[in-house]
Amino acid sequence: MKKTYFISDLHLSENRPKLTALFEHFMHNIAPQAQAVYILGDLFDFWVGDDEKSPLISRVQAQIKQLTEKNIPCYFIHGNRDFLLGEKFAESCGLQLLPDYKIVNLYGTDTLICHGDTLCTDDVNYQTFRRKVHQKWRQRLFLLLPLKVRIKIADKIRRQSRHDKKMKSAEIMDVNGEFVCQIFERFNVRQMIHGHTHRQNIHQIPPHFKRIVLGDWHDDYASILEVSEQETYFLPQTAR
């Protein structure tokens, strides 16, 4: 049976080895069954440049390369934590980078895929920050800094983000329903898949739209969406 897998928001880091093991289990035992695998952002908890080397990065690189060498394409849309992941890393393992919004045909259904952070328009402070850090000249300047300095800056931003989340309401950090409907109309699709909010669900939106939200990963649970010609559902998946 033809099938495609979607994952996002793993937030892999050196201090979460069980998460890395869970990702490796997925890539070794589940992903090879697919026609394609889509990673919709925040694969890593942070990314400061393709020049960083670590055991974690090498392990993830190896898993993606093993999959793509089996002629199973692996696609990636940048998240808010790993938007600096670049062509150098992608080329090293066969990962295919996609734009922020991409329409893919899933067994006859045109589907818009994205990370999901752009849909959270009520979070004005975040959207302002996002526009700034996505400016190419800022990114080029940042990548010119020494690696140790970039890591310190990323860690500071990450800690500030955690603090800000505690101060924001759940509604602000979720998607804006009106904007979502505008996106459906703009791209002329009836189905959307995204991550970012960590609120795994399949929403039916009248009159005929479907919005599928990928969940985040935990040490003992992986949010994996399987799409086939017959059905769309989340796999039950626990740590190995």
Swiss-Prot record:
Residue numbers binding substrate: 80-81, 123, 161, 165, 168, 196
Matching InterPro entries: Calcineurin-like_PHP_ApaH, LpxH-like, Metallo-depent_PP-like, UDP-diacylglucosamine_Hdrlase
Gene Ontology biological process terms in this record: lipid A biosynthetic process
Primary location class: membrane
Family annotation (PANTHER family): UDP-2,3-DIACYLGLUCOSAMINE HYDROLASE, UDP-2,3-DIACYLGLUCOSAMINE HYDROLASE-RELATED
Descriptive protein name: UDP-2,3-diacylglucosamine hydrolase
Function: Hydrolyzes the pyrophosphate bond of UDP-2,3-diacylglucosamine to yield 2,3-diacylglucosamine 1-phosphate (lipid X) and UMP by catalyzing the attack of water at the alpha-P atom. Involved in the biosynthesis of lipid A, a phosphorylated glycolipid that anchors the lipopolysaccharide to the outer membrane of the cell.
Family of the protein in this entry: Belongs to the LpxH family.
Keywords from the UniProt entry: Cell inner membrane, Cell membrane, Hydrolase, Lipid A biosynthesis, Lipid biosynthesis, Lipid metabolism, Manganese, Membrane, Metal-binding
Origin superkingdom: Bacteria
Binding residue positions for Mn(2+) 2: 42, 80, 115, 196
High-level lineage: Bacteria, Pseudomonadati, Pseudomonadota, Gammaproteobacteria, Pasteurellales
Pathway of action: Glycolipid biosynthesis; lipid IV(A) biosynthesis; lipid IV(A) from (3R)-3-hydroxytetradecanoyl-[acyl-carrier-protein] and UDP-N-acetyl-alpha-D-glucosamine: step 4/6
